[in-house]
Amino acid sequence: MVNDRWKTMGGAAQLEDRPRDKPQRPSCGYVLCTVLLALAVLLAVAVTGAVLFLNHAHAPGTAPPPVVSTGAASANSALVTVERADSSHLSILIDPRCPDLTDSFARLESAQASVLQALTEHQAQPRLVGDQEQELLDTLADQLPRLLARASELQTECMGLRKGHGTLGQGLSALQSEQGRLIQLLSESQGHMAHLVNSVSDILDALQRDRGLGRPRNKADLQRAPARGTRPRGCATGSRPRDCLDVLLSGQQDDGVYSVFPTHYPAGFQVYCDMRTDGGGWTVFQRREDGSVNFFRGWDAYRDGFGRLTGEHWLGLKRIHALTTQAAYELHVDLEDFENGTAYARYGSFGVGLFSVDPEEDGYPLTVADYSGTAGDSLLKHSGMRFTTKDRDSDHSENNCAAFYRGAWWYRNCHTSNLNGQYLRGAHASYADGVEWSSWTGWQYSLKFSEMKIRPVREDR
């Protein structure tokens, strides 16, 4: 329509001016319209460029900006084309005729609005994403100082723990050193104490001999003590042997298990007889040889006996008492270490519960004297002491020596021998809780073999 109108007006002008051959000069209105049209085009281009610049500044790396191009629609009109990012086109036709300036400005404003709307739609999604990213960055910025502070606290705590660990390690090393020193001091003290006790025992024995051991006993002793003397040859009455010496005298010469019938134990019991050591006739009441039997037991087991007579065993306190109260007995102790070294200890007098009306209530006290042998004396210290087990404490120590040294014995405070201790197979780190005979191998060596056996003192000895 605009073009038709333009053509019509041009035709009219030509009809009116046909008689005139002289060309007319452009009017002021026409110049003004041309200037305004140029300004409008420049304004549109400037606005579009500014928006595109802002779009590139705030959303780098997004879709390419709209492309604005201009051109002539006809000889008397201009065409502005905007190509959007989605390949759609926006065309604006600009009419330079002065009579329609209002419409031209309206179209210009509409074009500007269209351009702005297109740019807004183009930037909407990236800006939304940018806002979310900015919000996330703000949140992270707020949390970062807290995380750094917590990391610093954890690092401080870690350093403190490392320092504490180092202090504990130093303390533990010091305690271990102190423990070793105390063990050494205890071992030395135990040795000094053993020598002191042995010396005192020797002095007391000498004093007793000086005062005369053959003096009559007081009335109480005579009432309590059974008659004990040397054994005559052969069995006392009948054919029942009272111990292994009677078995030997009856003609049996082989080691083995035999039945004996002590004077105060007429029901009798079986024992192992050693028929070879120093003439034979020995009744065995204790043997350790391989660790197959547990010797860390309570009172009832040690009273009644346990184990195998042909292997490791303990005959029982009540049976040892029955044997040693019917005559005067001597004790022989055989020992062997794990290097096949051997030694022995002999005691000319031995008895269990000799002066007791109720030996179990009295704790089966030990009587032993007159040492000789190659192993050294480790038993005289225990003479006069009651038997102690882990569940019946009769020693002179503040602690239960049986529980502490893992055995059962006539402990005093605590021991110089512990033949019923743990079978530890030679040298051991623990202190005095093995099969010990301290005068021969010390307190930290557990023997391979021990055997305790008794025999009556005969007239010809």
Swiss-Prot record:
In Swiss-Prot or TrEMBL terms, this protein is called Fibrinogen C domain-containing protein 1
- Compositional bias (Basic and acidic residues): 15-24
Give yes or no: UniProt keyword Glycoprotein: yes
Q: From the UniProt record, report the name of the gene that encodes this protein.
A: FIBCD1
Mind telling me which residues the site (Implicated in ligand binding) is annotated on? Y405, H415, Y431, A432
Q: Which InterPro entries would you find in this protein's record?
A: Fibrinogen-like_C, Fibrinogen_a/b/g_C_1, Fibrinogen_a/b/g_C_dom, Fibrinogen_C-term_domain, Fibrinogen_CS
Region listing for Disordered, in residue ranges: 1-24, 214-238
Residue positions binding Ca(2+)? D393, D395
Q: What does this protein do?
A: Acetyl group-binding receptor which shows a high-affinity and calcium-dependent binding to acetylated structures such as chitin, some N-acetylated carbohydrates, and amino acids, but not to their non-acetylated counterparts. Can facilitate the endocytosis of acetylated components.
Q: Which Pfam families match?
A: Fibrinogen_C (PF00147)
Which residue spans traverse the membrane? 34-54
Which residues does the UniProt record annotate as the domain Fibrinogen C-terminal?
Answer: 235-458
Q: In which tissues is it expressed?
A: Expressed in the small and large intestinal epithelial cells with a highly polarized localization to the apical surface corresponding to the brush border and in the ducts of the salivary gland.
Any ranges marked Cytoplasmic in the topology annotation, and which?
Answer: 1-33
Question: Glycosylation positions?
Answer: N340
The entry's cellular-component GO terms read: collagen-containing extracellular matrix; extracellular space; membrane
